[in-house]
Amino acid sequence: MSATINPVVDNSVFTDCEVADLSLADWGRKEIAIAETEMPGLMALREQYAGKKPLAGARIAGSLHMTIQTAVLIETLVALGAEVRWASCNIFSTQDHAAAAIAARDIPVFAYKGESLKEYWDYAHQIFEWTSDGSHAANMILDDGGDATLLLILGSRAERDPSVIANPSNEEEQVLFASIRSRLTSHPGWYSRNLAGIRGVTEETTTGVHRLYEMEKKGELPFPAINVNDSVTKSKFDNLYGCRESLVDGIKRATDVMIAGKIAVICGYGDVGKGCAQSLRGLGATVWITEIDPICALQAAMEGYRVVTMDDACDKADIFVTATGNLRVITHDHMLKMKNQAIVCNIGHFDSEIDIASVQKYQWENIKPQVDHVIFPTGRRIIVLAQGRLVNLGCATGHPSFVMSSSFTNQVLAQMELWQNGKDYQKKVYVLPKQLDEMVARLHLGKLGVKLTELTDEQAHYLNLDKNGPYKPEMYRY
């Protein structure tokens, strides 16, 4: 896709981007302006730090859903002194007007809604292509799901041992491995050179964090990482309250289905599953939960949900939502047994939770973008949303701005910390200190009209606390 600048900015031409339509930039800019009023954390960081430029010299390779809210994050990073190159971390999650607005500010972005897998991995390479002669390269990664980090690490391993990309296990790996092989031929040593320049990564989501901890455990983590996901002001807000609003938004935009009276199955009762269950119950659905963890299963039961297995539920429920981060949670056999017109969707990061590959052999009927009928030989149909990828971003616009402000404020603080103090960190996975977590929360209270009670000196002494926090021990679970 070619890119020519819309005359919104200086009538100049900016070609270091791949977006759907730069004429959408004005629309994107108007929505960004609205989002900024709902993102007090990011705006406070701009006000506090823009004059100090704490990210000056940072060249951030960003791989995160290219939404309106992400545009506010990108422009905050730039305001704090960083250079940025950006791609989306999902082929369906880009909001094209958001990407256009960022490109119109001469910020390199490579993303459009409905990318092919080949384009997705091409764009993942592009965020590391700082200069054609290699004189500058990315020195920080901001990741969501871990694909940008994976690309450099796997590519570097393949430089030493090509057999690591010899046997793909699925379609996505086929495309990724082919992309790496092509780069190994055209640019020998490209991956290891880029990897060597990275100071650290900040990771947004549960799935990507899991990858980082696995690498740390094996001694394969090449640089320090900050686990943004497990900041309380991310996981207990974005994952819970964000999904509570965006799941139903995606299902309703896609299908116009009446939720009330339906049986809905949520696979997984972590923070994401809890938010999904609340939203569906709030609209009148009977909600069932599947779980492997006895603690989460007990929580679900104590909240009044029925805890079942997919084998029990697959032929009875009307709506199925996966929220586990696992693979093949909904199998071919489960889908064969589902009711006619059952709705099947996923809100976990990757598309592995529903075994979509196993039903590709049947007839597919596209209803509209990201909404498909799978027609079985019996004539029964199920409705698959976003091809098993993130339903809230594929079929809607993701989480609301306010809750993303909380998550993204953590991201900016994590980038600042690693950029300024990365040499003090070992090649391990870290979380931000609780004092910063509480600061992020404080930045968002005023928007909601919240007034905090302040401890008296006597009370603080009694509790053995600093009056200004932190207020809870590290192990406190909220």
UniProtKB/Swiss-Prot annotation:
Keyword NAD: yes
Pathways per UniProt: Amino-acid biosynthesis; L-homocysteine biosynthesis; L-homocysteine from S-adenosyl-L-homocysteine: step 1/1
Cofactor(s) needed for function: NAD(+)
Record field: catalytic activity: S-adenosyl-L-homocysteine + H2O = L-homocysteine + adenosine
Tree of life domain: Bacteria
GO molecular function: adenosylhomocysteinase activity
Family: Belongs to the adenosylhomocysteinase family.
Binding site for NAD(+): 205-207, 239, 268-273, 291, 326, 347-349, 392
EC number: 3.13.2.1
EC category: hydrolase
Subcellular location field: Cytoplasm
Cofactor comment: Binds 1 NAD(+) per subunit.
Gene Ontology BP terms: L-homocysteine biosynthetic process; one-carbon metabolic process; S-adenosylmethionine cycle
Species the sequence originates in: Nitrosomonas eutropha (strain DSM 101675 / C91 / Nm57)
Protein name: Adenosylhomocysteinase
Known role: May play a key role in the regulation of the intracellular concentration of adenosylhomocysteine.
Keyword NAD attributed: yes
UniProt KW keywords: Cytoplasm, Hydrolase, NAD, One-carbon metabolism
GO CC terms: cytosol
Residues where substrate binds: 67, 144, 204, 234, 238
InterPro entries documented for this protein: Adenosylhomocyst_ase-like_sf (IPR042172), Adenosylhomocysteinase-like (IPR000043), Ado_hCys_hydrolase_NAD-bd (IPR015878), NAD(P)-bd_dom_sf (IPR036291), S-Ado-L-homoCys_hydrolase_CS (IPR020082)
